[in-house]
Amino acid sequence: IAPIHRLSKIKHVNATTFQAVSGAGVEGMRELREQILQLDKGEEVHPNVFPAQIAYNCIAQIGTYLDDGYTTEEVKMHNEGRKIMHAKDLQVNCTCVRVPVYRSHSISLTVETEQEVSLDAIRQAIKNFPGVELIEDHVPTPVEASNQDIVYVGRVRKDISRENSISLWCCGD
C-alpha cells in the first residue's frame, strides 16, 4: 500500500489475509500433508497445530482470541501496518484466515485515500515500486508467488461502494 500512500494519504485499510500453513512452520506444513492423505483414505483427522482441520478447509483464526473478538495476529497486522507506514492515525481492520496452501500468503485489500486518485496513477505507482510487480493479464496466485522475492499485485479496481477507495489482491512468499 506504500505506493498508494505516496499518491494520497491512506485513511483506512480493510484487509483479509489468506495465510499459508508455512506460517506455522514445518509442523503446519506436515499437518496439512498428513490430513490430506488421511482424508483421501477416508480416515478421521485430529488437528494438533491448528484449531481445526486445515485440509480442504479455511480457519478464520490465527493466534489466540482476545476479549474484543480479534486475534493476536489481527492486532499484530493492525499495529505493524501503522508502524511500517509511519502513520499512527492509519485505521486498519483485518481478518486473518489460515488456508490449505503450503507456501505464500495472499491478501485482499480495500484502501481508502484522503483524495481521489486515478486507477492509472495507482497502477503506475505499483509498477514503479521496487519489489512489487503489477499483474494485469491474469490473477496472481500463491503458487505463482512461491519462492519469489517479489509481491504480485492484481485485480486493481475502484471500490464501487466507497469514494476514494480501491480494492486489490496481493500474493507474496
What is the meaning of each model-derived region?
Residues 2-125:
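Active-site-lining helix/loop region of Rossmann-like oxidoreductase modules
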Residues 91-173:
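C-terminal active-site/capping subdomain that shapes the small-molecule cofactor and substrate pocket
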